Amino acid sequence: HQVFEEECVVRGVTSQVITDVQASSIKQQILQPDVNMDIIELQKAPRIAVYSPKNRQPWDDAVTLALTYAEIPYDVVYDHEVMSGMLPTYDWLHLHHEDFTGQYGKFWAHYRNYPWYKEDVAANEEIASELGFKKVSELKLTVTKKIRDFVLGGGYLFAMCSATDSYDVSLAADNIDICD
């Protein structure tokens, strides 16, 4: 325990050693049917991927900042990696500000005429073309289905912000052209 305690002190993390009886009590509380929790015992550190475009955005991704600060290793993956079948090599996938509908995100209304936003649109169109798609929305639907298959295969998915809505909209719009 001493190595872990020293590491916590160095990082400014408060920790407490508990007895087996205390651990058992905590587990019993978690296993109550009216509690929305579960116990997950990690046998190994999960291999984490963060789905994010390769070009920098003006807003920060809080998750990559937190992972970097905590010194938790992760890889950044985007459409090329997903389309190449790399997702099953990861245990965990994180989605954040992505727009899986091909409508270029929630920032379109305010930032569509900004140079950095136009560059982002052009980059997405270029990636779609490179991967053989006529439209970004077609690429993003295929990416969404690959993410769905990753989860169905046992992968963990954590989505937040606009990724949650746009992921569902993308799947719901299958066979419907929702983009000009």
Show where each model-derived region lies.
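Intrinsic-disorder/low-complexity accessory segments
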Residues: 1-151, 166
